[in-house]
A protein has these predicted regions:
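N-terminal Rossmann-like dinucleotide-binding module
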Residues: 2-66
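Beta-loop-alpha module in the N-terminal Rossmann-like domain of NAD(P)-dependent dehydrogenases
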Residues: 66, 70-121
Length: 121
């Protein structure tokens, strides 16, 4: 298959918004969540249902600033919500431990590599 520069005009650069929106649960309350994910969800009119972070105070602050109804005190409660999309934005060192706990058939978005090196991943 060959690619021609003229083909660029046929590339889809915008996709339609979903007709039904699932609840979003965020794992991690660091800078990328505060500065990028939450503003993007707000712009797309997505409601974030809940947030969890090892540092509960960070999750509470994000919840207050972005009108998030649920702050989970433990990871299992967040992961076991039904009919959700998981947004996982944690450091690579802990990502794999979280991924192993995700229920089967879950929809999730991962933000980091699954390890600190190729060997770990």
């Amino acid at each position: 298959m060959s690619f021609k520069i003229e083909d660029i005009k046929n590339l889809n650069t915008q996709w339609p918004m979903p007709t039904s929106k699932k609840k979003i649960v965020i794992i991690g309350a660091g800078g990328i969540v505060k500065d990028a994910h939450l503003p993007a969800y707000q712009k797309g009119e997505y409601k974030v249902h809940g947030i969890y972070d090892l540092e509960e105070s960070k999750a509470k602050k994000c919840a207050e600033d972005h009108s998030i109804d649920n702050v989970y005190q433990n990871l299992d409660d967040a992961l076991n919500e039904k009919n959700i999309i998981l947004d996982i934005a944690v450091p690579p060192a802990v990502l794999l431990d979280i991924v192993k706990k995700i229920p089967k058939n879950s929809i999730c978005q991962l933000q980091k590599p699954v390890g600190n090196s190729l060997e770990e991943a």
